[in-house]
């Protein structure tokens, strides 16, 4: 290790907790992981963290659709996401959630500091409101035409075509995504972050030279058009953190989402019992390095709002943003109908993780260019590079070493100068990994692989093996081939973790960047086993077909209670608190003359009797069986006069009706009159 060890904190953008991880997500997580693994190989202290972005109206509404709580949904999604990332060997030190105690505390702290420093403004705004659903519409639940570039079907907060941000009220011909209705305007008090106050600081940060040229140029466009105050609040109903001392107002998801980076790191420090690192990494004058790997669609939030929030609350700013482009498949946007919208979990059923890691890495650079996953080219490149050039180099030599020399390598290198050529390449390849010029690194490595294979071709160990008296030559040639293979795999270790583990088992030696100067001499390797299998287009065809089938299954009509009886519009806690539910003992139950649907129930509320008519006769043909049973009733429902008498409440039951009605009963131990909360 010739460099000074650095402290580095690396993050990926937080996946939203309402959907599965797909190959578009994986580009970023693979890119970051390759960079992190290289940094660790060079001896740096790296903390690699991520979390699920778990707040917002989309999560609230999807949970309602599924008939579960948002907490349950994001918990299940977190497990799925972590399983997918583990399957691709993404080496996170911690994976957390923005719906956490750490994130709440830090969000409130940053907001409070911003407010105390005069950067939070209050004002009443006119906001889009869905008259059919009775709710204010968050940015992402309004679509219309972008007011800047006039692109159609854009969300209410930013345009995915030109990258502009704006207020949903600026959209041309807006429509509610929830109901399709044309929204109306209503007034509401909102909280704003005074972004323009940080314009000078942000422009200086932009001119520092650290940012990618494309990012800096885009930021300059935003400065020229003028920074606007940023609305950081949303009205109830909303799934997120309530703003301190502002009932019914919640932090906008984009306020607490990047703070999730801090929350995840704080959670990691707490798990380790580390009471100092959080401040060391996040204090204003920290000498640790902080890097965010993000997609080009969220540059605005990370390059303007996030550093301004940190500056205004006396935390450190990012060292840099590493921005990448989108993923296309076979030259086009990922498509569910064509089977190219591929989930991470589906990929792993047909290919290993290393194959995609390699292909993405071979195409990545430090620029913000889109990456095309051409599936035919993918098969050809994996077979040509990993199998034919790298793994084949080992297999061509290992057999002779195992069979003829009991696995022991030669005591000297056959060609020390050639070996030095390979180890000297560490500087160029290392710089390519460091600067995220991944494609260049792969090209350099594969050029060396060609040289190594040419050496074996020229030395022809299969010919030497048949010649008497040349055992020493055979051992030297094959040992040289294996040592060159070892150097190549050391360079590839950040990209191919699974293959690297197999190679280390075969070599009986760890692939260590700083150890390549010393070749393996008189060293015993283990029996060679197949390291990597060829792939073919049949696997691709099966993958695409499986993706199509998943789309069909997801699009199949939903059946069951939720489909027949969709969840009603959201109510507030105050609305629910008006309903007084009580445990009631059924003292008597009888038929009602003149009605084939009703039963007359006499209910004891623990000192008060109620007469209730209930339409449950078809499900309970023997009313006497209900006597002595406890149920739950709405005790404060206004009495209703019927021709059979006055009904003084309502008993609670589940089911669609007819014979499928099921009275609700409390657990044993509940007493008549107790309130149900």
Curated annotation (Swiss-Prot):
Q: Where in the cell is it found?
A: Cytoplasm
Q: How is the cofactor bound?
A: Binds 1 zinc ion per subunit.
This enzyme catalyses:
tRNA(Met) + L-methionine + ATP = L-methionyl-tRNA(Met) + AMP + diphosphate
Annotated residues for binding of Zn(2+): 146, 149, 159, 162
As annotated in the record, motif 'KMSKS' region runs over 333-337
Check the record and name the SUPFAM superfamilies matching this protein: Anticodon-binding domain of a subclass of class I aminoacyl-tRNA synthetases, Methionyl-tRNA synthetase (MetRS), Zn-domain, Nucleic acid-binding proteins, Nucleotidylyl transferase
Binding-site residues for ATP, renumbered to this chain: 336
Stated EC number for the protein is 6.1.1.10
Q: Which GO terms describe its molecular function?
A: ATP binding; metal ion binding; methionine-tRNA ligase activity; tRNA binding
Instruction: Provide the tRNA-binding domain boundaries.
Output: 575-677
Q: Which GO terms describe its biological process?
A: methionyl-tRNA aminoacylation
The record ties this protein, via InterPro entries, to: aa-tRNA-synth_I_CS (IPR001412), Anticodon_Met (IPR041872), Met-tRNA-synth_bsu_C (IPR004495), Met-tRNA_ligase_1 (IPR023458), Met-tRNA_synth (IPR014758), Methionyl/Leucyl_tRNA_Synth (IPR015413), MetRS_core (IPR033911), MetRS_Zn (IPR029038)
- Enumerate the UniProt keywords alphabetically: Aminoacyl-tRNA synthetase, ATP-binding, Cytoplasm, Ligase, Metal-binding, Nucleotide-binding, Protein biosynthesis, RNA-binding, tRNA-binding, Zinc
Q: Which CDD domains match?
A: Anticodon_Ia_Met, MetRS_core, tRNA_bind_EcMetRS_like
Q: What's this chain's function?
A: Is required not only for elongation of protein synthesis but also for the initiation of all mRNA translation through initiator tRNA(fMet) aminoacylation.
Q: How does it assemble?
A: Homodimer.
This protein is called what? Methionine--tRNA ligase
Q: Which organism is it from?
A: Salmonella typhi
Lineage start? Bacteria, Pseudomonadati, Pseudomonadota, Gammaproteobacteria, Enterobacterales
